[in-house]
């Protein structure tokens, strides 16, 4: 089904190719001329790069159907987070990303300055 019309992956690849062509159409300015001339070329180049960047963001948001801004991740308060020393190494993270491990008893990670 890779060739069907409206395939989201193919549409994304086409959008990325278009963005690549946009960036390639604006090469870095050459280093010839006086200092002021080079400065003006770089200033115009940066302005074009900004325009290309904003166009690229608009293309990607239209293609992906969402905004370019990341969705904020809700994290629990840092005071409640703790290292869980009692966790079985074979279990892994079965709880997933949404359920952080909160230990009731504080575990001792470093001993109090005694050497053996």
Curated annotation (Swiss-Prot):
Keywords: AIDS, Host cytoplasm, Host nucleus, Host-virus interaction, Methylation, mRNA transport, Phosphoprotein, RNA-binding, Transport. GO terms for biological process: mRNA transport; viral process. Residues 18-26 are annotated as: Homomultimerization. Residues 36-48 have a biased composition (Basic residues). Pfam families: REV. It is found in: Host nucleus, Host nucleolus; Host cytoplasm. A motif (Nuclear export signal and binding to XPO1) lies at residues 73-84. Residues 26-48, 84-116 are annotated as: Disordered. Homomultimer; when bound to the RRE. Multimeric assembly is essential for activity and may involve XPO1. Binds to human KPNB1, XPO1, TNPO1, RANBP5 and IPO7. Interacts with the viral Integrase. Interacts with human KHDRBS1. Interacts with human NAP1; this interaction decreases Rev multimerization and stimulates its activity. Interacts with human DEAD-box helicases DDX3 and DDX24; these interactions may serve for viral RNA export to the cytoplasm and packaging, respectively. The RNA-binding motif binds to the RRE, a 240 bp stem-and-loop structure present in incompletely spliced viral pre-mRNAs. This region also contains the NLS which mediates nuclear localization via KPNB1 binding and, when the N-terminal sequence is present, nucleolar targeting. These overlapping functions prevent Rev bound to RRE from undesirable return to the nucleus. When Rev binds the RRE, the NLS becomes masked while the NES remains accessible. The leucine-rich NES mediates binding to human XPO1. Belongs to the HIV-1 REV protein family. HAMAP family: REV_HIV1 (MF_04077). This is Protein Rev. The lineage of its organism: Viruses, Riboviria, Pararnavirae, Artverviricota, Revtraviricetes. The gene is rev.
């Amino acid at each position: 089904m890779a060739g069907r019309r409206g395939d989201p992956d193919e549409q994304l690849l086409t959008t990325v190719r278009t963005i690549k062509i946009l960036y390639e159409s604006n090469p870095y300015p050459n280093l010839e001329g006086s200092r002021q001339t080079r400065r003006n070329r770089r200033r115009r180049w940066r302005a074009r790069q900004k325009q290309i960047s904003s166009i690229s963001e608009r293309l990607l948001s239209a293609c992906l159907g969402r905004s370019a801004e990341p969705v904020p991740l809700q994290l629990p308060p840092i005071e409640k987070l703790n290292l869980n020393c009692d966790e079985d190494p074979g279990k892994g993270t079965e709880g997933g990303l949404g359920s952080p491990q909160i230990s009731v008893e504080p575990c001792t990670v470093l001993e109090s300055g005694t050497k053996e």
